[in-house]
Amino acid sequence: MRDAALRYPNILFDLDGTLTDPREGITRSVQFALARLGIDEPDLARLEHFIGPPLLQCFMQTYGFDEARAWEAVNHYRERFRVTGLYENRVFDGIPELLEALVGRGHTLYVATSKPGVFAREIARHFAFDRHFKAIYGSELDGTRTHKEELIRHLLDSEGLAAEHCLMIGDRMHDLLGASRNGVACIGVGYGFGSEDELRAHQPTHYCADLAALRQVLESH
């Protein structure tokens, strides 16, 4: 039963780096895509910046690809990711308990991810946390709604939610920017893939270095 006093009855979670650690699946799939294009990158750590931002833009910015070449890379990435990379992932310790507690308090939960929705829903199903969420919103395979600002606006409109009743939680600047540009409060979490400097520079409503701090902040909202 919803607590009428909840400050933010609706909570939007990013997926990669916030609910799960997708490091292996994403970096190995990027490595695979690059190899298909004749680029050898043996160091997976050098590919971790692909976790979070829109994939197409990340290929363009990192390797100087034009859009057509970047789409080639994205399609090669998906060849591996949809079969193997989806499952090279793990739910962060403490997340299932946090989601259970939030739902128990009456919050309605959503996923808002730049990852294609078809992949996000399969990850949530496979790792058995989909039951906690009213809906899982992601981008389309054609690149529509890969930007967080557009995605969050679409979620708010589709669900009929007032921005002031929503809270976005994410680990990268894109999450914070997307939220703030829609008038949504946001929490930056430091246990994912964005640095504290990156997150604080975008002035989140709260910064939580770890899951314990996140839980403490959420208990007050």
From Swiss-Prot:
This is 5'-nucleotidase. It comes from Pseudomonas aeruginosa (strain ATCC 15692 / DSM 22644 / CIP 104116 / JCM 14847 / LMG 12228 / 1C / PRS 101 / PAO1). Keywords: Hydrolase, Magnesium, Manganese, Metal-binding, Nucleotide-binding. One of its GO terms (molecular function) is metal ion binding. InterPro entries: HAD-like_hydrolase_sf, HAD-like_sf, HAD_2, HAD_sf, PGP-like_dom2. Belongs to the HAD-like hydrolase superfamily. Its EC number is 3.1.3.5. The active site is at D14. Specifically dephosphorylates nucleoside 5'-monophosphates to nucleosides and inorganic phosphate. Displays high activity toward 5'-UMP and 5'-IMP, significant activity against 5'-XMP and 5'-TMP, and low activity against 5'-CMP. CDD domains: HAD_5NT (cd04302). It comes from the Bacteria. Its cofactor is Mn(2+); Mg(2+). The keyword Hydrolase applies.
